Amino acid sequence: MRREVFEDNYEAVYKYIRYLTNDQELTHDLLQETFYRFYHKNYTEYERTYLLKIARNLVYDHYRRKKIIGFFQLNSEPIAKEGLPEEIIERNAEIEKLYGALQKIKWNYREVVILRYIEEYSVKETAMILNCSEVKVKNNTARGLKVLRELLGGEKDV
C-alpha cells in the first residue's frame, strides 16, 4: 500500500515542491518529509490532495524559518523538446516569459495558477489543497490569469 501510494504520487509531489522552491536538494528533503508525515497520519482518502497539502505547509514552514519572502522561481530548464529547432527555441522562450511573469504576481494567485494549469487539478481539489473555498479558488484563478495576461501583453493563450 505505501509503495503504491509513493509510486502513484511521487512525480506530482516532486514537481509541485520543485516549482515552489527551484532547489533540487531542498525539494528532495521536503519530499522525504512529506511522505514521512503522510505515512504517520494514516490518510486513506484523497492521498494526493493530502500529500500536496503537507508539501505546501512544509515549503511555507521552511521559508518562514528562513524569513524569505518572494521565494517562488520556476525551473528555467527548457521544457519543449519536440519539433523543429526554431519551434523549440520559440516555445522555450514563451515558457520562460510565462515563468518570469508568474514570479511577478501575488503568491496566492501564483499558487492557484500552478495547481490549476500546471498541475491540472480541479477547482475542488485545489480548494482542498489550499484549505479554502471553491469560490476563492475561482476568484484567485481569474485574477491571476488577468494579471498574467497584462504582464504578457494581453496574450489570450494564458
Where are these regions (language model features)?
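A short, charge-rich alpha-helical start-of-domain segment used by transcription regulators
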Residues: 1-15, 19, 25-28, 104, ...
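Structural recognition of an alpha-helix C-terminal capping motif at a helix-to-coil junction
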Residues: 29-36, 45-57
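Arg/Lys-rich amphipathic alpha helix in sigma70-family domain 2
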Residues: 56-74, 91
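Acidic, proline/glycine-rich intrinsically disordered inter-domain spacer in sigma factors
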Residues: 77-103
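A short pre-motif secondary-structure segment
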Residues: 112-116
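DNA-recognition helix of helix-turn-helix
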Residues: 128-154
